[in-house]
């Protein structure tokens, strides 16, 4: 018999539909239709997700979340409070107890640190809380107490802790090294707050089962990394670090040695003055001896440019990132110029617009320079695009050029003369005068381009009139 009315659908069909909606949206949309739907929602629906995110959903959430907690607490799978306005109000109104026996994931965004401290002990009674994400906008001075409470959660596998306003070296993490009885179950740990070497090792002493570690702000609080006791994390295979303080390459090397882990994926972002980070031979030695299982390497080094500041230059041997070590692993050096920065990147090779490169001989000429800024002299009096390019040429030759900003023909010609090995060129927006009023530099550029034999492929992304380049 064909179903002619939505109401004639079986309960199981509605349960399938409910899986695509937030719990408050379900109450808002269905609970007032009739008695059947009201009872259907109150009874035993499948696991529900409760999420407060964008402002438009605030009213629906506020009007219905208490009903969800009253009637469906046992079916609640996740509670995600992303609102900057209501997180503290809602979190403080919830009584967390063992009746949340299906709750697996909690997110508290912009939660007050004192409220967080009062809630965390209550979460120990949740039998299936596997994932916890915290973002506090308070100004904590000591995060050690928060970590003690987090490590007491018996079932947690994933923890992300962000202290948005904790952006200075006044923040400390007073935490002793864990005993065997204190070790927890965390396998994925993401920390976004200041953290010194000794504090980091104290934290991970509580996580012997750690598989992935990401910390976004490693600070050097005058701590000797050599004096810290080594740690054994046999399951750690994925490590991501961001360094924004003066931590040398040698200190990083000691840190890697003391982790005693078989990393397969390593990601490093750094803004420091130590140009040893750009020494391919030092990296090769470190990876061969300390990270022999490494399969993926992601590296980002930013060289900062500013007036009245001497940007450190690399004076080592040039073109070392195209040795067999790098080519066999298909880890390719790329360079990007953004406002005030030359960014050096190493990452696995990906197909580009001009072709798929397969052989190592061709990979040796895959180094690309991308320019998001072509006229820094607009903002500074003494720094020019040529300074950025020469900084890069100290490290490597360039074979591919991409320009992601508007550029005039005269400026492009000057850049290409600095890069005689470039063989592909991709331009986002090239400004050339109309043919009837070509300026001298436009004619000179077109003549230069027509006689250029090295460049074999050119892509103009936003050319409105192709007659301009004929």
Show where each model-derived region lies:
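Eukaryote-biased activation of long, low-complexity terminal tails and linkers
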Residues: 1-470
């Amino acid at each position: 018999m064909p179903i002619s009315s939505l109401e004639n659908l079986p309960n199981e069909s509605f349960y399938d539909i409910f899986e695509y909606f937030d719990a408050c949206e379900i109450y808002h949309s269905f609970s007032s239709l009739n008695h059947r739907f009201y009872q259907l929602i109150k009874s035993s629906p499948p696991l529900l997700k409760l999420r407060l995110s964008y402002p438009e959903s605030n009213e629906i959430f506020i009007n219905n979340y208490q009903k969800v907690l009253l009637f469906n607490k046992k079916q609640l799978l996740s509670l995600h409070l992303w609102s900057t306005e209501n997180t503290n109000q809602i979190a403080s109104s919830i009584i967390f107890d063992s009746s949340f026996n299906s709750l697996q994931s909690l997110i508290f965004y912009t939660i007050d640190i004192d409220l967080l401290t009062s809630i965390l002990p209550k979460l120990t009674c949740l039998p299936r809380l596997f994932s916890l994400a915290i973002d506090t906008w308070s100004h904590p001075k000591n995060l050690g107490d928060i970590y003690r409470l987090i490590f007491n959660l018996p079932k947690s596998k994933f923890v992300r802790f962000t202290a948005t306003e904790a952006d200075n070296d006044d923040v400390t993490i007073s935490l002793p090294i864990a005993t065997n009885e204190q070790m927890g179950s965390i396998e994925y740990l993401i920390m976004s707050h200041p953290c010194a070497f000794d504090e980091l090792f104290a934290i991970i002493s509580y996580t012997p089962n750690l598989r992935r570690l990401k910390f976004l702000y490693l600070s050097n609080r005058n701590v000797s990394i050599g004096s810290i006791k080594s740690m054994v994390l046999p399951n750690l295979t994925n490590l991501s670090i961001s360094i924004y303080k003066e931590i040398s390459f040698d200190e990083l090397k000691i840190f890697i040695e003391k982790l005693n882990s078989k990393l397969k994926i390593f990601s490093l972002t750094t803004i420091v003055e130590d140009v040893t980070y750009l020494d391919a031979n030092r990296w090769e030695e470190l990876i061969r001896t300390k990270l022999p299982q490494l399969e993926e390497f992601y590296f980002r080094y930013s060289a900062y440019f500013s007036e009245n500041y001497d940007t450190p230059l690399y004076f080592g041997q040039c073109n070392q990132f195209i040795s067999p070590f790098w080519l066999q692993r298909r880890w390719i050096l790329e360079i990007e110029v953004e406002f005030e920065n030359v960014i050096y990147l190493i990452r696995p090779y990906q197909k580009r617009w001009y072709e798929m490169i397969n052989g190592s001989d061709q990979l040796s000429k895959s180094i690309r320079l991308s320019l998001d800024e072509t006229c820094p002299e607009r903002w500074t009096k003494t720094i020019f695009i040529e300074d950025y390019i020469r900084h890069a040429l100290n490290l490597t030759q360039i074979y591919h050029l991409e320009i992601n900003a508007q550029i005039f023909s005269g400026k492009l010609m000057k850049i290409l003369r600095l890069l005689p090995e470039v063989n592909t060129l991709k331009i986002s927006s090239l400004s050339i005068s109309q043919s009837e009023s070509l300026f001298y530099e436009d004619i000179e550029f077109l003549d230069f381009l027509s006689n250029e034999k090295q460049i074999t492929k050119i892509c103009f992304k936003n050319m409105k009139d192709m007659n301009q380049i004929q």
